[in-house]
From Swiss-Prot:
Domain STI1 stretches: 133-172, 521-560
Segments carrying motif Bipartite nuclear localization signal: 241-258
Description of how the protein assembles with itself and partners: Co-chaperone that forms a complex with HSP70 and HSP90 and preproteins (e.g. chloroplast preproteins).
TPR repeat locations: 2-35, 37-69, 70-103, 244-277, 279-311, 319-356, 358-382, 383-416, 418-450, 451-484
Protein name as it appears in the record: Hsp70-Hsp90 organizing protein 1
Pfam families: STI1-HOP_DP, TPR_11, TPR_8
Entry-annotated residues carrying Phosphoserine: S167
Gene (UniProt): HOP1
One Gene Ontology biological process: chaperone-mediated protein complex assembly
Primary location recorded for the protein, binned into one broad class: cytoplasm
Domain observations: The tetratricopeptide repeat (TPR) domain, forming a carboxylate clamp (CC), mediates interaction with the highly conserved 'EEVD' motif at the C-terminal ends of HSP90 and HSP70.
Post-translational modification: Phosphorylated. Acetylated.
Length: 572
């Protein structure tokens, strides 16, 4: 069973046995080859073993299976970073942020990737910045002296190479085209080398001057050719386009006034006059959409897409038609299945042109489809039955089977906090701590007064040796159920472990593990890099009197306590 193999893989990953995790994820993928989460998890395991090429392959497969899942881009960026492909890592994280602009993991990854790019460009060629970014091509295209060079493939190849590796500029400086381009990019005029042979100009001092008495002969101006008259057919076509454009403007004005019937008349006239501009069709489709005539809107959008591809119209115009079609389909949707063609239309639109509005509409449609599915599937009675089946398997210690029934119970009733609590316990038994923690937190979110939710969450934290966090969770549960013995016993266990660490009674292995875990905590990292705290730690070792003064500061004392809990500082 794929879920069982996945749970075993997650458990191995949590314990740091990445090779075993990879084996279990591979087994799960063989059973469920279209499950994007499995490829994502295996990518993370490969990356943990510094097998970045394999991690990259799995990350790409993740995105292929689920293009709009942000974690896939996070995996892709991490793999590129591991392979020192910093620019590609930046691109991957940015694509992920297009999908989910608020994703903190992607933001953090992007910052790391950009920092790596900056470090890789340390001590750059003094002219390197001039060749970076798309502005280079814009400047070369707009300057008459370099515009023609862009038609020469060897020149384009040289400039692309310099963009990739600015230090290679020295290899091409003998090429006058590169020198000319450098002058344009730096806004500096380089003096060209003197012409050779017959092309050399004669200095004025050596030239014979004409006698002042000889009259200057005025050159006869060549007659300029008269402009050729436009071909009648071309002229008619131009006139038709102008006429159609005016009709479109009249339609736009009517649309702004909410005079939809008049707007449709003008757009229809424009379509009859000029069928080579699909904007008339998409505009009429927009009017039909406002009027609630969704079938007519979809018909116009289909025509616009078909005609746009025939004419090789701008991708943005084709994407607009597909987005409008998707919007009309969502308006007509009455069940989860009705959202499928709308989602397909939005996905095709994004293939033509990535647009934030279209992406938002796609996410909304997928969310609505899921809500409809849950609504149609919602049955609390069947959910209770599935939960009881899960309980039976749990008692028999058949945890993967129990998880299967708890998952079905949650699908039948997403608000069943007990199903989340029981599934959290099953995941914990399998060693799948991240999943267990997630379910326990969801249980608490659904019912903050349910004490089992707190004990489930704290049990995971205790297992992970996060004793301070576990104690906070137990205490939060006691606020709702002060006499709960399981929560009270949990607090005692946490206090024992914390005191044991504070007394320095840990074995060298336990201390090393605790310190390693503590160093992964961003808060601990910030404390250790704080100049003030570094001075405090130095005084604790070398200047006891100064240390006593520091201890009178509550903020400093709180930070010291955190370092003690993490095993970084030991008080003897």
């Amino acid at each position: 069973m794929a879920e069982e193999a996945k749970a075993k893989g997650n458990a191995a990953f949590s314990s740091g046995d990445f090779t075993t995790a990879i084996n279990h994820f591979t087994e799960a993928i063989a059973l469920a080859p279209t499950n994007h989460v499995l490829f994502s998890n295996r990518s993370a395991a490969h990356a943990s073993l510094h097998q970045y090429a394999e991690a990259l392959s799995d990350a790409k497969e993740t995105i292929k299976l689920k293009p709009y899942w942000p974690k896939g881009y996070s995996r892709l960026g991490a793999a590129h970073l591991g392979l020192n492909q910093f620019e590609l890592a930046v691109t991957a994280y940015k694509k992920g942020l297009d999908v989910d602009p608020t994703n903190e993991a992607l933001k953090s990854g992007l910052a790391d990737a950009e920092a790596s790019v900056a470090r890789s460009r340390a001590a750059p060629n003094p002219f390197g910045d001039a060749f970076q970014g798309p502005e280079m091509w814009t400047k070369l295209t707009s300057d008459p002296s370099t515009r023609g060079f862009l038609q020469q493939p060897d020149f384009v190849n040289m400039m692309q190479e310099i963009q990739k590796n600015p230090s290679s500029l020295n290899l091409y400086l003998k090429d006058q085209r590169v020198m000319q381009s450098l002058g344009v990019l730096l806004n500096v005029k380089f003096r060209p080398p003197p012409p050779q042979g017959d092309e050399a100009e004669v200095p004025e001092s050596d030239m014979g001057q004409s006698s002042s008495n000889e009259p200057e002969v005025e050159k006869k101006r060549e007659p300029e050719p008269e402009p050729e008259p436009e071909v009648t057919e071309e002229k008619e076509k131009k006139e038709r386009k102008e006429k159609a454009k005016k009709e479109k403007e009249l339609g736009n004005a009517a649309y702004k006034k909410k005079d939809f019937e008049t707007a449709i008349q003008h757009y229809s006239t424009a379509i009859e006059i000029d069928d080579e501009d699909i904007s008339y069709l998409t505009n009429r489709a927009a009017v039909y959409l406002e009027m609630g005539k969704y079938n007519e809107c979809i018909e116009d959008c289909n025509k616009a897409v078909e005609r746009g591809r025939e004419l090789r119209s701008d991708y943005k115009m084709v994407a607009r038609a597909l987005t409008r079609k998707g919007t009309a389909l969502t308006k007509m949707a009455k069940c989860s299945k009705d959202y499928e063609p709308a989602i397909e239309a939005f996905q095709k639109a994004l293939t033509e042109h990535r647009n934030p509005d279209t992406l938002k509409r796609l996410n909304d449609a997928e969310r609505a489809k899921k809500e409809w599915e849950q609504k149609q599937y919602f049955d609390p009675k069947l959910g209770d039955e599935e939960r009881e089946k899960g309980n039976d398997f749990f008692k028999e210690q058949k945890y993967p089977e129990a998880i299967k029934h708890y998952t079905e119970a949650i699908k039948r009733n997403p608000n069943d906090h007990k199903a989340y609590s029981n599934r959290a316990a099953s995941y914990t038994k399998l060693g799948a701590m991240p999943e267990g923690l997630k379910d326990a937190e969801k249980c608490i979110e659904l019912d903050p007064t349910f004490s089992k939710g707190y004990s489930r969450k704290a049990a995971v934290q205790f297992f992970l040796k996060e004793y301070d966090n576990a104690m906070e969770t137990y205490q939060a549960g006691l606020e709702h159920d002060p006499s709960n013995q399981e929560l009270l016993d949990g607090v005692k266990r946490c206090v024992q472990q914390i005191n044991k660490a504070n007394r320095g009674d840990l074995t060298p292995e336990e201390l090393k593990e605790r310190q390693a875990k503590g160093m992964q905590d961003p808060e601990i990292q910030n404390i250790l890099t704080d100049p003030v705290m570094r001075q405090v730690l130095s005084d604790l070792q070398e200047n006891p009197s100064a240390a006593q003064k520091h201890m009178q500061n509550p903020m400093v004392m709180n930070k010291i306590q955190k370092l003690i809990s993490a095993g970084i500082v030991q008080m003897k």
